[in-house]
Every structure is written in structure tokens, then in C-alpha cells.
Amino acid sequence: MAATLSRLDISVDGVSVTYNNARLALYNATCTVEPGTITALVGPNGSGKSTLFKSIMGFLQPSQGRVRIGGFSVQKAQKQQLMAYVPQADEVDWNFPVSVFDVVMMGRYGYMNVLRIPSAKDRRLVMESLERVGMVKYRDRQIGELSGGQKKRAFLARALAQEGKVILLDEPFTGVDVKTEKGMIDLLMELRDEGHTILISTHDLASISTFCDHTILLNRTILAQGKTEETFTKENLELTFGGLPMLSLNQMFESTEVDA
């Protein structure tokens, strides 16, 4: 059955993940990403953010618990191309001999037959996606020749070409200049207004309150979640980050107030 919902939520229910070395990466994580919103996933390095992302995308099988996308299992959501993923830079082989156009076309693979011959619609959507992220002039460039911000925009274009209603972005602002970050944030807000559900993992705490509707705080388990103005507090951040000095948190909040 094809998904008929125009807006899809992400439901994570009691998810735990244990790696082969018996290390517990995620414990009893329960949270909801509301449909048609931008939600920030925040936590220190090693807190399980990427593990949670990979569990939602179906790249990892939880040892317990389940994930649902708009009420669908992850497997059904994958088959229906409901989800798109923008990975961290270190997950990509930048030496692989593919062009930007080829990378964005990969977002259409789920709609093609085994021969992977692009249709006119596939090519049109790829070009429209490149246009939307401002990367048309780089379409023939080898992916490894791009700057950090251009690489992120290329993979965001791939997510757009895939036409997934749910978009996950893992640290999309790392290695990106301020202008590129603002452009990406503006586009994410447009996508939200169009009905996309967006989950974004980020270390850029200062910008979260400017564009994220909700925030989830994670450190091996979910510590707090809710509307950003209610959840993104110094007290909750101290709980999440542990030893992060109060001075750093004060500076971050002062920076946010000035930028706003």
C-alpha cells in the first residue's frame, strides 16, 4: 500500500543498540519527531546520535525496540522511498570517481529498474534539485573536488531528488562557512513549510533556537524532548553535556540572543 500521508512522523519506541564488542551505544531511547517540523538532535560526541540515525534509516538493527515512519515499519518506509539521508563527511569515499550529477542521481535509484537507466523525469528532478541548492554549475565536477559546503549541498540535493518526506541530516554544518550554513537553514525551513519532517544532528548549539521547532537531548538515552524554547535550557544542556562549563553555556545563550 502506498503512503497517502502528506506529513510523516518518526516514532522511536524503547530502542537499544549494542555493537558486536558488547558496547551499549543506545539504551531504551524513546522519542517522537513531529510531522512537518525541524527537530534538532543534540548530544556530546559518542552520545549515540549517529547510532540513532542509523537505526531510523534501517542501517542498524536495534537489539530491542522499534522505529516507525508515519506508522510504517522502516522496511516499508525504505521501499516507498519515504526517507532520505545526508551523511557525515567521514562516511563518504570522496575519491570515488563520480560526478556531482551522478551522486544526486543516486537519489533516484529506488525508482529505477535493475538496469538503472534514468528516465526523463529522473533527469529533470536531479537538475531541479541541483538548482535548488545552487549546485548546477558544479554538476560535472568530481565529488572530491568540492569544498566542504559544496559537498553538503550535493548530498542535500540527492535527498531532494529522492523525494523523501522525511529527511535526516547528520552534522550538516560541520566544515561549512556561515553563508552556506544560512543558505542551508533557509532551504530546510522551506522544506519544512512544504510538509517535510526533518531531523538534524548538530553541534552548532547557537543556531538551534533560530530554526528548530523541537529539540531532543541525547546521551545514550533520551534525556529531554519537546519544543525548543521549553527543552533547550541551560539546565537540560548541563544534564546532557555533563562537564561543559556554565560559562560556555552562558556565552552560547548570549550569542543566540544577539543573533536573534
From Swiss-Prot:
Which Pfam families did the record assign? ABC_tran (PF00005)
Q: What SUPFAM superfamilies does this protein map onto?
A: P-loop containing nucleoside triphosphate hydrolases (SSF52540)
Annotated CDD domains? ABC_Metallic_Cations (cd03235)
Query: Which GO cellular component term is one of those annotated?
Result: ATP-binding cassette (ABC) transporter complex
Residues that coordinate or bind ATP: 43-50
- In this chain the ABC transporter domain maps to 10-245
* Key words, A-Z: ATP-binding, Manganese, Nucleotide-binding, Transport
Q: Does the keyword Nucleotide-binding apply?
A: yes
Q: Name the Gene Ontology molecular function terms of this record.
A: ATP binding; ATP hydrolysis activity; ATPase-coupled transmembrane transporter activity
Similarity comment: family membership: Belongs to the ABC transporter superfamily.
Q: What role is this protein assigned? A: Part of an ATP-driven transport system for manganese.
UniProt-recorded name of the protein: Manganese transport system ATP-binding protein MntA
Species this protein is from: Synechocystis sp. (strain ATCC 27184 / PCC 6803 / Kazusa)
Q: Which gene encodes it?
A: mntA
